[in-house]
Amino acid sequence: MEKWRIYSFQKEFERRCGLNSSLGPIETTGEDPNRKDTVKNIQSWEDCDNSSCSNVDHLFGVKDNENFISDDTFVVFDIENQIFEIDNDHSFLNEPFSSYSDRNSSYLTNVFTSEDPYYNRYMYDAQYSWNNHINGCIDSYLQSQICIDTTTVSGSDNDSYDIHGSVCDGESHNSSEGESSSRRTHTKGVDLTIRESSNENERESSNENERKSSNDLDRTKKYRDLWLQCENCYGLNYKKFLKSKMNICEQCGYHLKMSSSDRIELLIDPGTWDPMDEYMVSQDPIEFDSEGEQEQEQEQEQEEEETYKDRIDFYQTKTGLTEAVQTGIGQLNGIPVAIGVMDFHFLGGSMGSVVGEKITRLIEHATNNFLPLIIVCASGGARMQEGSLSLMQMAKISSALYEYQLNKRLFYVSILTSPTTGGVTASFGMLGDVIIVEPNAYVAFAGKRVIEQTLNQTVPEGSQEAEYLFEKGLFDLIVPRHLLKSVLSELFEFHALFPLNQNSNQVEC
């Protein structure tokens, strides 16, 4: 059982937040000289032979305090049994009193005991309320002076205290040096206990966060097919509504990737689409996954388990397409056009021998039938699995366009979407009579990662986007997706390409 001395009632008090300015911190001994004869030994927390005392003054204000005068008041802590009591020589807390006036409101009422089951200790028990008030004051003082958090200074009820803590600078005033060292040793032990408990709390919180993240991941996998995340703002867009919104993000207006079939529906009048060469498929012309290469490049095969043919079959099943481009004839607001639309969802829209052949045949058909030509580009470049055959498509398509544009004087519109890179940018992507680009489209010859790894230089942000390149004169128009069809129609009419129902005798440019 340990006692702390508190001189509380000498005169009318004023409400204070801390100790009296005349008193030092809790580490120093400040005894009233007039009360030296009544000073009692206050046993240490650890050594019963040593003593330590401190005066706590001006904790709260009292207006009517005639009945509360006391010379010696002790705060008694029983740490083992977790008991907090007030020991007073005059036992004034056990005597009935009329009123206790606080600065804000009356705090205590008349004292009486009751056996009623609905008896409220806070309302009718003056000693309990007094203890509760003292506890709150000491709690505030300990937190400000001894740096003990509310999580470490707590009680199961307001009348019992369990104190675990340490002084800020690891010191506490005692009557001897030995007791001081003993106190510091005890403080270190308590600090260790606090750190261990905090580590346990951190581990519990981290485990809880891991469980929450795993649950979120499971939900994400479960509903992944219902939502599409924006590449720009990372907002979620409901897939069923995307098609009606032309694959434009609802949050930021960013133009998301669009399948070739959706683009055909966007540009071509309903019921006028006539596909060309839709059954032409790739046959692995250079045998990219031959046995000789497998023996020489075993490490690469471990990383890429699927062969080129397997990947072709996979994307054919996933997209419902035979290759990375769709070509055909249709009408745009009644104007007959030859159009080719690349699909980035099929092997990144890479250009292989089949893609090059289909585009070349489309250009030749438009040349022979005097049709305007539209090619929508969305590609990562030449297809590496076909080697030099894929690079050859650049020259083949460019030769067909030379005949179409220069010899026949026909009109070719190139539409660049995100991303358009590599061999497509270096060939037919930039050969249009009018080059249109979508907002924020990524257009480049070599990607940012390739440039930085090759030249060991940082590529500035935004230097390969449509707006920056448009300022440099690389494109003619930046057209949002919802205005694209009307802009194309006006361009064709400007070049004397009218709908069939208005003028049967079309004049070719």
Swiss-Prot record:
Subcellular location: Plastid, Chloroplast stroma
Co-factor: note: Binds 1 zinc ion per subunit.
Swiss-Prot/TrEMBL cofactor(s): Zn(2+)
ZnF start-end (C4-type): 230-252
Binding site for Zn(2+): 230, 233, 249, 252
Reactions the enzyme catalyzes: N(6)-carboxybiotinyl-L-lysyl-[protein] + acetyl-CoA = N(6)-biotinyl-L-lysyl-[protein] + malonyl-CoA
Transferase keyword on record: yes
Origin superkingdom: Eukaryota
InterPro entries: AcCoA_carboxyl_beta, Acetyl_CoA_COase_Trfase_b_su, ClpP/crotonase-like_dom_sf, COA_CT_N
Keywords for this protein: ATP-binding, Chloroplast, Fatty acid biosynthesis, Fatty acid metabolism, Lipid biosynthesis, Lipid metabolism, Metal-binding, Nucleotide-binding, Plastid, Transferase, Zinc, Zinc-finger
Example GO biological process: fatty acid biosynthetic process
E.C. designation(s): 2.1.3.15
Catalytic EC class: transferase
Stretches assigned to the CoA carboxyltransferase N-terminal domain: 226-509
GO cellular component: acetyl-CoA carboxylase complex; chloroplast stroma
Gene Ontology terms for molecular function: acetyl-CoA carboxylase activity; ATP binding; carboxyl- or carbamoyltransferase activity; zinc ion binding
Signal peptide bounds: none
Basic and acidic residues biased stretches: 170-182, 193-216
Region of interest (Disordered), ranges: 164-216, 288-307
Pathway stated in the Swiss-Prot or TrEMBL entry: Lipid metabolism; malonyl-CoA biosynthesis; malonyl-CoA from acetyl-CoA: step 1/1
Similarity section: Belongs to the AccD/PCCB family.
General function of this protein: Component of the acetyl coenzyme A carboxylase (ACC) complex. Biotin carboxylase (BC) catalyzes the carboxylation of biotin on its carrier protein (BCCP) and then the CO(2) group is transferred by the transcarboxylase to acetyl-CoA to form malonyl-CoA.
Subunit structure: Acetyl-CoA carboxylase is a heterohexamer composed of biotin carboxyl carrier protein, biotin carboxylase and 2 subunits each of ACCase subunit alpha and ACCase plastid-coded subunit beta (accD).
HAMAP family in alphabetical order: AcetylCoA_CT_beta
Name of the protein: Acetyl-coenzyme A carboxylase carboxyl transferase subunit beta, chloroplastic
